[in-house]
UniProtKB/Swiss-Prot annotation:
S-S bridge residues: none
Keywords assigned by UniProt, alphabetized: Chaperone, Cytoplasm, Nickel insertion
GO molecular function terms listed in the Swiss-Prot or TrEMBL record: nickel cation binding
GO cellular component terms, A-Z: cytoplasm
High-level lineage: Bacteria, Pseudomonadati, Pseudomonadota, Gammaproteobacteria, Pseudomonadales
Protein name (database record): Urease accessory protein UreD
Keyword Chaperone attached: yes
Gene: ureD
Subunit architecture: UreD, UreF and UreG form a complex that acts as a GTP-hydrolysis-dependent molecular chaperone, activating the urease apoprotein by helping to assemble the nickel containing metallocenter of UreC. The UreE protein probably delivers the nickel.
C-alpha cells in the first residue's frame, strides 16, 4: 500500500545482518539476524546451488524522519550472493533525518550482487544513505542504485528537503571509489546542465573488473528512451551513470548493462529475479 506523503514523526529503528558460506557447491545463509521491521524472505537458488538469492523486505513500506535502517551482508569465501528488493524504497516527508547504513563485505573468491529497486525521495524528506563496501582478494562486485527525487507522475517536484549519500568501495583496504552527494530541494543543480539537467532520476552502477573496448562500446550503444548514460573504465572498476525521466527507464538501462556485463565479468548469464516481474 502506498501511504500519503504526510508529515511523520514516530521513529522506527531496524537492523538486518546477513552472512553466507559455501558448503560444497552450495551457497547458504549462515546468519540472519534482524531487529525491527527489516526482514529477508526465504532464500532461493533459482540459478542453481551456487547462487543464493535473498529478497530484503521492509514491511512498513516507507522510511520517515527518525528512522534508522542498518543493513550488513557478509559474503564468505567462494560464495555467490544476490540481494534485491520487491519494490521501491520510499522516503517520506518528515521533520527529522532518516538514515540508512549499508555495509557489504565480500571475501576472496566470492561474488556479491546488490540489485535493489529504486529509492523514491519525496519532497520534504531528509534522507541520508551511507554505504561501505569491502572487497578482499579477487572478490567480485556488481552494485547499483537508482534514486528518484520527488514524484513527477504526481506533479511533485523535489522542492524541499534533502538527499545525501556517501559511498566508499575498498579492496584490501585500498580505496577504489569515494563519493559524496548532497541534493537539496529547490537547488539550482536540479535543473542545471552540470547537475541533473531537469531529470528527476539518476542511477549509478559499479562493477569490479575491466572490460575491453568492444564490450564498452556495446554497453554505450544501449538505447533506452528517456535515458542519458555513459560508462567509464577505471583501474579495476567499471562505473556507469545515467539521468532518466522515470525510475523504470533507469532500471531498464541498468538491466540491459547487467545482461551484457554479467557474462563477461562474472561468467554467468543474467537471469532476472522473478520478483522484478511481479
Amino acid at each position: 500500500m502506498n501511504l500519503p506523503a504526510a508529515l511523520f514523526t514516530p521513529s522506527w529503528p531496524a537492523e538486518l545482518e546477513l552472512a553466507y558460506a559455501r558448503h560444497g557447491e552450495r551457497t547458504t545463509p549462515v546468519r540472519r539476524r534482524h531487529l525491527g521491521p527489516l526482514r529477508v524472505q526465504k532464500h532461493l537458488h533459482a540459478e542453481g546451488p551456487e547462487v543464493c538469492q535473498h529478497i530484503i523486505v521492509h514491511p512498513p513500506g516507507g522510511i520517515a524522519g527518525g528512522d534508522r535502517l542498518d543493513i550488513s551482508a557478509h559474503a564468505g569465501e567462494r560464495t555467490w550472493v544476490q540481494l534485491t528488493s520487491p519494490g521501491a524504497a520510499k522516503w517520506y516527508r518528515a521533520a527529522g533525518v532518516a538514515r540508512q547504513d549499508l555495509r557489504l563485505r565480500v571475501e576472496a573468491g566470492a561474488t556479491l550482487e546488490w540489485l535493489p529497486q529504486e529509492t523514491i525521495v519525496y519532497a520534504g524528506a531528509q534522507a541520508e544513505l551511507h554505504t561501505q563496501i569491502e572487497l578482499h582478494g579477487d572478490a567480485r562486485l556488481f552494485y547499483w542504485d537508482i534514486v528518484a527525487l520527488g514524484r513527477p507522475a504526481a506533479d511533485e517536484r523535489f522542492a524541499s528537503g534533502h538527499f545525501q549519500a556517501a559511498l566508499d568501495v575498498r579492496r584490501d583496504g585500498r580505496l577504489l571509489w569515494h563519493e559524496r552527494q548532497r541534493v537539496s530541494g529547490g537547488d539550482g543543480l536540479l535543473d542545471s546542465p552540470i547537475g541533473l539537467n531537469g531529470q528527476p532520476v539518476f542511477a549509478t552502477l559499479l562493477v569490479s573488473g575491466e572490460v575491453d573496448n568492444e564490450l564498452l562500446e556495446r554497453c554505450r550503444e544501449v538505447n533506452i528512451d528517456g535515458v542519458r548514460g555513459d560508462l567509464s573504465q577505471l583501474a579495476g572498476l567499471l562505473v556507469a551513470r545515467c539521468l532518466a525521466s522515470e525510475a523504470l527507464k533507469a532500471r531498464a538501462w541498468l538491466i540491459a548493462l547487467w545482461r551484457l556485463l554479467r557474462p563477461a565479468l562474472l561468467g554467468r548469464e543474467a537471469v532476472p529475479p522473478r520478483i522484478w516481474s511481479t
